[in-house]
């Protein structure tokens, strides 16, 4: 009798054991929710930018004064490669512009290469250049 009161206090009694419903596996199978529809919808998502092909531009410059370096740097900032011909400038001014452009290219993680006697190629970060023209120029200079 004392055990019955104690059992009821904790929720354990002989009456409760009689009221339990046996578990069947058929109930579990009915509760499953199909998830294949969600996965099929996600497979149809396509990035908008994946079909668009970007065009790359190369800008040619023949600077005559130091202030022209700003335009060259602006094109590099706009992800355009720049070929600079210093044939019509004195060497001191050309060195100043090359120093300025080299700083710009360094800040952008780009590259600058000498491709001729007074010709440089400056490229922004995502441009690839292949080959070396400098070797051909050196061979030509040795032949002359």
UniProtKB/Swiss-Prot annotation:
Disulfide-bond pairs as recorded: none
Pfam families from the UniProt entry: SepF (PF04472)
Keyword DNA-binding attached: no
Chain residue ranges for the region called Disordered: 14-41
Location within or outside the cell: Cytoplasm
Biased composition (Acidic residues): 14-31
Alphabetized UniProt keyword annotations: Cell cycle, Cell division, Cytoplasm, Septation
Presence of the UniProt keyword Cell cycle in the record: yes
UniProt superkingdom: Bacteria
Record-level GO cellular component terms: cytoplasm
GO BP: division septum assembly; FtsZ-dependent cytokinesis
Cross-referenced InterPro entries: Cell_div_SepF, Cell_div_SepF/SepF-rel, SepF-like_sf
Function as written in the Swiss-Prot or TrEMBL entry: Cell division protein that is part of the divisome complex and is recruited early to the Z-ring. Probably stimulates Z-ring formation, perhaps through the cross-linking of FtsZ protofilaments. Its function overlaps with FtsA.
PANTHER family (UniProt xref): CELL DIVISION PROTEIN SEPF (PTHR35798:SF1)
The protein's assembly and partners: Homodimer. Interacts with FtsZ.
Family to which the UniProt record says this protein belongs: Belongs to the SepF family.
Name the UniProt record assigns to this protein: Cell division protein SepF
Origin species: Lactobacillus johnsonii (strain CNCM I-12250 / La1 / NCC 533)
């Amino acid at each position: 009798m004392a055990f019955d009161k104690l059992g009821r206090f904790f929720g354990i009694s002989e009456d409760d054991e009689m009221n339990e419903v046996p578990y069947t596996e058929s109930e579990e199978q009915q509760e499953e929710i199909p998830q294949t529809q969600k996965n099929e919808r996600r497979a149809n998502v396509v990035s908008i930018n994946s079909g668009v092909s970007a065009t790359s531009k190369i800008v040619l410059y023949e600077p005559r004064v130091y202030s022209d370096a700003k335009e060259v740097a602006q094109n590099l900032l706009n992800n355009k490669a720049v070929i600079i011909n210093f044939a019509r400038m004195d060497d001191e001014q050309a060195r100043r512009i090359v120093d300025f452009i080299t700083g710009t290219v360094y800040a952008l993680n780009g590259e600058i290469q000498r491709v001729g006697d007074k010709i440089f190629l400056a490229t922004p970060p995502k441009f690839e250049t292949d080959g070396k023209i400098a070797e051909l120029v050196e061979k030509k200079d040795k032949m002359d």
